Amino acid sequence: ANDPDFPYTVQANRP
């Protein structure tokens, strides 16, 4: 699950 609020998750997220 990818959360936009979270700075970093299991996968690389772009803030």
UniProtKB/Swiss-Prot annotation:
Keywords, alphabetical: Cell wall, Secreted
GO cellular component terms, A-Z: extracellular region
Annotated compartments: Secreted, Cell wall
Protein name according to UniProt: 40 kDa cell wall protein
